[in-house]
C-alpha cells in the first residue's frame, strides 16, 4: 500500500508522519527505511507499506497513492483538484481526514 499524508503545511504533515510511525509500532510493524529531511518524509515498513508526508499545494500534481490522510485544515479546492485525483491507485483507495 502507498499512502500520502497531506498537511496544510510541512510541519503538520511531519507531526502526523511521526504519529503514524508510532501507530505502526503498536501493531508490531517495524520501519525498514526512514528518510527525514527538511522537505521530505518517507517511511517503508516491513509489511511493504510506504508512506510519505507532504504539504498540500497545487505544486503537488502527479502524486499517486492508495490512501490519503488529509489535514482537516487543507482547502477543499486542493482536496478536490489535487488530492482526490492522486488517490486513485488500484486495487483500493481511501481518503480520511486528520486533526492535530
Segment roles from a protein language model:
Residues 1-100:
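Short, flexible loop motifs at catalytic/binding sites
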Amino acid at each position: 500500500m502507498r499512502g500520502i499524508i497531506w498537511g496544510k503545511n510541512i510541519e503538520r504533515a511531519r507531526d502526523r508522519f511521526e504519529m503514524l510511525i508510532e501507530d505502526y509500532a503498536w501493531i508490531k510493524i517495524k520501519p525498514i527505511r526512514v528518510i527525514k529531511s527538511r522537505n521530505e518524509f518517507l517511511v517503508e515498513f516491513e509489511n511493504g507499506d510506504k508512506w510519505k508526508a507532504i504539504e498540500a499545494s497545487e505544486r503537488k500534481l502527479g502524486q499517486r497513492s492508495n490512501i490519503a490522510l488529509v489535514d482537516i485544515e487543507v482547502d477543499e479546492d486542493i482536496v478536490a483538484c489535487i488530492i482526490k485525483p492522486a488517490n486513485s491507485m488500484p486495487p483500493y483507495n481511501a481518503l480520511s481526514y486528520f486533526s492535530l
